[in-house]
Amino acid sequence: MKRKTVIMDENNMKRAVARITYEILERNKGTDDLCVVGIFSRGVALAQRIASKIYELEHEKIPCGALDITAYRDDRKPADTFDRTKIDFDVKNKNVVIVDDVFYTGRSTRAAIDALIERGRPKSIQLAV
C-alpha cells in the first residue's frame, strides 16, 4: 500500500499543540472561566490534547466538550443522525475556545457558533485551528 503524504509528524504536532495552548493561556490570562469545545470529529481530539496540555502547564483541569454541528450546517441536507454533542458544563459567561483541525470557508465555524449560543451565552468565543 502506498503511503500518504505526511503533513505533520508527531513532534511537529506536539509543538503545534503547545503553541496553541500557550496562545490560549496568554490571551485569557490563565484558566479562569475557560473551556474548550472541539468540533466533531477531528476537532474533538485536538481539543482534548489542548485541555491536557493546559492541565500539564497550569495544573488546572478545564472543561472540554464535543460539538456536533451537523444540524447547523447551511450547505448540507439535514441528516437522519443523532446529535453527538457532549458538553457537560454550562457555557454561559465562559470564555469558550472552539477547536477544529482546519479552517476553509468558515461554514463550520459559523455553524459551531450557532450551536454553541443555543446552549448559553458565552462571555467570549475564540477559535483555535
PLM features: residue spans?
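PRPP-associated nucleotide enzymes
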Residues: 1-129
